[in-house]
C-alpha cells in the first residue's frame, strides 16, 4: 500500500486550485449544452456535434467562461512564479535583499534546514532564466486566453481566433522553457547524485579511465553521465510526452475541416491541459521534500554550481561532521576568492543570494 508522506510545504496544492475550476467549467458547459438539447446556435453556420467550447462560451455562459479562463490563467502564472520562488528565495521581478540567516550561516547542512529554499535551488543561471522566461511567456499566453473569452466568437470572431492562436503559441513556448529547465537540472543532478556511475566524478581532478571529460559542462550538450533517470529528468520527460500529444491534437484541431471532429480535439485539448498542472503539482511535492530525500542530503559536493556556491558563502573549505541535522557527511568544497575576482587577496567574499 502506497503511503502518503507529509509534504515539505503545501504549495503543491496551488496547481490543483488553478485547474479544478477549469474542469468544472468544461463539465458545466457540456451539461448545459446537453440539457438544452444540443442546440446549434444562431451564429453557427453548419450542423456539428459537439460544438466548440467558444460557441457555448458565447452564450449566457459567457461570464462563466471569462471567470474560469481568468482563474486558470492566473493560477498557471502563480504556479510558475512559485517554481521560481521556491528555487531562488524571491519572486520574479522582486528585488533581492540580504538574508543574514543564509549568507552568514556556516555550513551547507544549516542552509538546507534554514527554509531559504523550499525546493532544490537551480544549478546554473540558465535554469533561472528559463523559469523566468516560462513565467513571462505563460503570462502573455494566459492573457490571450482571457481576451479570447472576452472577445466572443459570436461578436468578434477574428479577434477571438487570433487570441486563441497567441495562447497556443506562447503556452507552447512556456512549456518548452519548463522542459529545458528540468532537463538541465536533471543533467547536473545526475552527475552529483550518490547513485552516479563510479567512473564519472565531476569533483575529481583525475579523469576516469573510460571518460574523456571531467565535468558536466565539458560534456557535449547531448551527452549525459551519472544517474540519468532522476526526478528532474523524469519530470522533463513527462512534460515532453504531454507537450507532444498536445501539439498533435492542436494540429488536428486546426487542420481538420470536419467541424465536429475538430471540436472533439478542442475538448480533448481542454481536458488534457489540466494534466500539466498535475505534473507541476508533483514537481512541487517531490521538490518540497528534498530535505528528507533519500539521496539529496548525501550528495558529497555541489561545488562549482552557481546557486549552491552563493548559498555556501563560496570561499571557505570545511567538512561538516555528521549530526542529527545533516544525517550524513556533507563535504562542502569551495574556492578562494581570487579565483573569482583575479585578486591576490585570500579574504573571503560574502555573496547575497
UniProtKB/Swiss-Prot annotation:
Entry annotated with the keyword Methyltransferase: no
PANTHER family: EG:22E5.9 PROTEIN, FASTING-INDUCIBLE INTEGRAL MEMBRANE PROTEIN TM6P1-RELATED
Keywords: Cell membrane, Lipid biosynthesis, Lipid metabolism, Membrane, Phosphoprotein, Transmembrane, Transmembrane helix
Protein family (similarity comment): Belongs to the SFK1 family.
Pfam family, one: Frag1
Cytoplasmic side: 1-11, 84-130, 182-231, 285-353
Stretches of the chain found on the membrane's Extracellular side: 33-62, 152-160, 254-263
GO biological process: actin cytoskeleton organization; lipid metabolic process; negative regulation of phospholipid translocation; vacuole organization
Residues where Phosphoserine is found: 208
Membrane topology: Multi-pass membrane protein
Function noted in UniProt: May control the production of phosphatidylinositol 4-phosphate (PI4P) by the STT4 PI 4-kinase. Mediates proper localization of STT4 to the plasma membrane.
Name assigned to this protein: Protein SFK1
Main location class: membrane
Amino acid at each position: 500500500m502506497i503511503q502518503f508522506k507529509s509534504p515539505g510545504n503545501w504549495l503543491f496544492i496551488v496547481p490543483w486550485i488553478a485547474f479544478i475550476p477549469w474542469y468544472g467549467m468544461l463539465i458545466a458547459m457540456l451539461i448545459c449544452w446537453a440539457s438544452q438539447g444540443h442546440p446549434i446556435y444562431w451564429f453557427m453556420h453548419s450542423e456539428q456535434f459537439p460544438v466548440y467550447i467558444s460557441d457555448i462560451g458565447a452564450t449566457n455562459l459567457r461570464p462563466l467562461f471569462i471567470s474560469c479562463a481568468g482563474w486558470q490563467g492566473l493560477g498557471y502564472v502563480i504556479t510558475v512564479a512559485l517554481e521560481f520562488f521556491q528555487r531562488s528565495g524571491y519572486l520574479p521581478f522582486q528585488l533581492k535583499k540580504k538574508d543574514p540567516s543564509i549568507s552568514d550561516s556556516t555550513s551547507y547542512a544549516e542552509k538546507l534546514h534554514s527554509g531559504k529554499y523550499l525546493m532544490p535551488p537551480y544549478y546554473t543561471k540558465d535554469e533561472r532564466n528559463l523559469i523566468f522566461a516560462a513565467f513571462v511567456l505563460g503570462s502573455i499566453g494566459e492573457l490571450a486566453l482571457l481576451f479570447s473569452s472576452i472577445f466572443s466568437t459570436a461578436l468578434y470572431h477574428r479577434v477571438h481566433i487570433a487570441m486563441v492562436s497567441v495562447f497556443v503559441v506562447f503556452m507552447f513556448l512556456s512549456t518548452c522553457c519548463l522542459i529545458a529547465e528540468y532537463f538541465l537540472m536533471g543533467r547536473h543532478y545526475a552527475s552529483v547524485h550518490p547513485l552516479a556511475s563510479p567512473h564519472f566524478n565531476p569533483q575529481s581532478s583525475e579523469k576516469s579511465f573510460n571518460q574523456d571529460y571531467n565535468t558536466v559542462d565539458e560534456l557535449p550538450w547531448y551527452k549525459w553521465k551519472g544517474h540519468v533517470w532522476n526526478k528532474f529528468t523524469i519530470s522533463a520527460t513527462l512534460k515532453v510526452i504531454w507537450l507532444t500529444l498536445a501539439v498533435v491534437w492542436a494540429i488536428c484541431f486546426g487542420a481538420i475541416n470536419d467541424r465536429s471532429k475538430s471540436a472533439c480535439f478542442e475538448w480533448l485539448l481542454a481536458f488534457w491541459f489540466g494534466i500539466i498542472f498535475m505534473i507541476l503539482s508533483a514537481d512541487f511535492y517531490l521538490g518540497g521534500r528534498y530535505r528528507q530525500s533519500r539521496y539529496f542530503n548525501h550528495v558529497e559536493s555541489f561545488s562549482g554550481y552557481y546557486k549552491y556556491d552563493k548559498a555556501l558563502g563560496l570561499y571557505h573549505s570545511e567538512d561538516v561532521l555528521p549530526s542529527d541535522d545533516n544525517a550524513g557527511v556533507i563535504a562542502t568544497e569551495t574556492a578562494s576568492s581570487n579565483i573569482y575576482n583575479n585578486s591576490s587577496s585570500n579574504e573571503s567574499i560574502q555573496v547575497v543570494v
